[in-house]
Amino acid sequence: MDQTPIADMKFETALAELEDIVASMEGGKLELEASIAAYKRGMELMKHCQNQLADAEAQIRVLENGQFKDVDRSTLEAQ
């Protein structure tokens, strides 16, 4: 299992690793400790992907309002 820092991953890379983790867990061949580690990594990847999707959605909302600028989630949450 890849241990690239999740914060450095692009959405597609994180999603692909998450899909691999799900497949290996569904296969039922992981030992208990490996399953727990895979579950933890998968949850971290899922959160990372959800955050990246939320950021993308926020940028789309800004573009739809005719405001062409970079935004981050903290800016939108303050509004």
Swiss-Prot record:
In the record, biological process GO terms are: DNA catabolic process
Provenance organism: Dechloromonas aromatica (strain RCB)
Q: Where in the cell is it found?
A: Cytoplasm
Instruction: State what protein this is by name.
Output: Exodeoxyribonuclease 7 small subunit
Q: Which is an annotated GO molecular function term of this record? A: exodeoxyribonuclease VII activity
Chief subcellular location: cytoplasm
- Which gene is the coding source of this polypeptide chain? xseB
Give EC number(s), comma-separated: 3.1.11.6
InterPro entries associated with the record: Exonuc_VII_S, Exonuc_VII_ssu_sf
Superkingdom of origin organism = Bacteria
Q: Which Pfam families match?
A: Exonuc_VII_S (PF02609)
